[in-house]
């Protein structure tokens, strides 16, 4: 195990140029060569991941992370564009033979979560987020995504002259969403030309989760849900806590709204036809225990898998919230922002890519995965070019599936052995796509 002090030293000691893997310029890199290269780079991937995990950064604040990425890519001979989409990095590797352009994407941002993993390289970082000082943790595995894509960069750089086409590596900030009032994520990366300089023909992404280690799963067409940020504001009348009848009881308003949201999601729409979720996770009101405040702000999220269901739920939520406010003599409004569309896996690419994934993890590929109510702004890339988004299982040995910490948990961790599988999956998807007729 690498301790807290030795992690950076290990990265520095291993940060060397990638060796050439194939001296025959006319031949595509073989499966054995890719496997050997992925195995060789595994210690570096682990070191990168531990370093990034120990130094997490929130969305649009990934300055240290992006500097590390740019440094490593430049050392490998990539053409590097920095400050794309604020703190994003794009690395371009032009192969020795002409061909198409394929992109691979990793997200870089962490979450305002207090880490409880007990790892030697656990985060102790605090940062400012929306006016508050918060703990910061890589609780969704983005540290592993960056490390694996750097490993992929190392493997690809070692076979550059045998690559038929160009590989674009997109290291994206703010996938979890920017702070209120900011822009960020895939939207800004696309606006800054991440898919256009050069013009990308297809894009692939990998995301770790608590499934069986080394399992690669995905499904054609809709895979991850669409996502909308929900903000509910209520304006009432302040009163003393001892005289609630003289004002608007905001606690009762909040309780009724929460109950109504649960009713809408579970009782007013056909849950069998298309899954949907409406969740309230934030309630802000009041400063003293004996004063009923004038204002209430609630925050949540909505997840759907079809445009029709999304539009229907938005209308229902807005109508219901306004009606509850009227009932209490308050003005209540529901606003939906930061929409992410459904993450759509191109059917043709989904069928084709299974063979590439089988080479990365033989016998552990599921191309009929269940729908995921999580959301991803990778979906914005998939709106622009054909795409496939794949999940990589990373549950540690001995951890029961039923109790494995999920993404966004303060206990979330990943079996480091799966990084090698992730690197192979990314390399095979990229190379096989470029060799595809």
List the model feature ranges, each with a label:
Residues 52, 91, 104, 142, ...:
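Divalent metal-coordination and catalytic microenvironments
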Residues 126-137, 143-144, 155-156, 161-279, ...:
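Histidine/acidic-residue-rich, glycine-tolerant segments that coordinate divalent metal ions
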Residues 28, 75, 255-437:
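Metal-dependent amide/peptide-bond hydrolase catalytic core
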Residues 39-46, 56-67, 139, 143, ...:
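Soluble non-cytosolic domains of exported or imported proteins
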Residues 28-138, 147-168:
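Acidic/His- and Gly-rich active-site-bordering loop/insert found
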Residues 19-26:
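Sec/Tat signal peptide C-region and signal peptidase I cleavage site
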Residues 6-19:
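Bacterial N-terminal signal peptides
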Residues 93, 234-236, 302:
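Hydrophobic beta-strand positions in extracellular immunoglobulin-like domains
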């Amino acid at each position: 195990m690498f301790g807290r002090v030795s992690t950076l030293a290990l990265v520095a000691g291993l940060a060397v140029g990638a060796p050439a893997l194939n001296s025959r310029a006319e031949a595509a890199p073989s499966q054995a060569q890719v496997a050997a290269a992925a195995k060789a780079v595994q210690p570096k991937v682990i070191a990168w991941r531990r370093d990034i995990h120990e130094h997490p950064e929130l969305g649009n604040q990934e300055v240290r992370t992006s500097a590390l990425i740019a440094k490593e890519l430049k050392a490998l001979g990539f053409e590097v564009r920095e400050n794309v989409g604020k703190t994003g990095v794009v690395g371009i590797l032009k192969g020795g033979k002409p061909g198409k352009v394929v992109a691979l994407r990793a997200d870089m941002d962490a979450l305002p979560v207090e880490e409880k993993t007990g790892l030697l390289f656990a985060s102790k970082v605090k940062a400012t987020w929306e006016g508050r000082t918060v703990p910061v943790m890589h609780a969704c595995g983005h540290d592993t995504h960056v490390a694996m894509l750097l490993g992929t960069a190392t493997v690809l750089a070692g076979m550059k002259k045998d690559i038929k086409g160009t590989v674009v590596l997109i290291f994206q900030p703010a996938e979890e969403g920017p702070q209120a009032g900011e822009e960020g994520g895939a939207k800004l990366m696309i606006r800054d030309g991440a898919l256009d300089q050069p013009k990308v023909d297809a894009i692939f992404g990998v995301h770790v989760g608590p499934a069986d280690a080394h399992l690669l799963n995905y499904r054609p067409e809709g895979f991850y849900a669409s996502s909308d940020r929900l903000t509910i504001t209520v304006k009432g009348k302040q009163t003393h806590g001892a005289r609630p009848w003289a004002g608007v009881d905001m606690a009762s308003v909040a309780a009724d709204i929460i109950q109504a949201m649960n009713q809408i999601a579970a009782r007013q729409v056909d849950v069998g036809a298309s899954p949907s979720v409406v969740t309230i996770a934030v309630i802000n009101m009041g400063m003293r225990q004996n004063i009923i405040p004038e204002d209430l702000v609630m925050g949540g999220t909505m997840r759907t898998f079809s445009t029709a269901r999304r539009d229907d739920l938005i209308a229902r939520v807005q109508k219901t919230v306004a009606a509850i406010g009227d009932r209490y003599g308050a003005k209540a409004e529901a606003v939906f922002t930061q929409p992410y569309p459904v993450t759509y896996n191109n059917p043709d690419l989904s069928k084709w890519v299974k063979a590439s994934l089988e080479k990365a993890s033989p016998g552990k590929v599921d191309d009929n995965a269940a729908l995921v109510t999580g959301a991803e702004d990778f979906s914005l890339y998939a709106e622009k070019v054909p795409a496939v988004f794949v999940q990589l299982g990373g549950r540690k040995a001995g951890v029961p599936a039923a109790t494995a910490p999920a993404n966004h948990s303060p206990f979330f961790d990943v079996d480091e052995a799966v990084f090698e599988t992730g690197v192979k999956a990314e390399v095979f998807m990229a190379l096989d796509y470029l060799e595809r007729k």
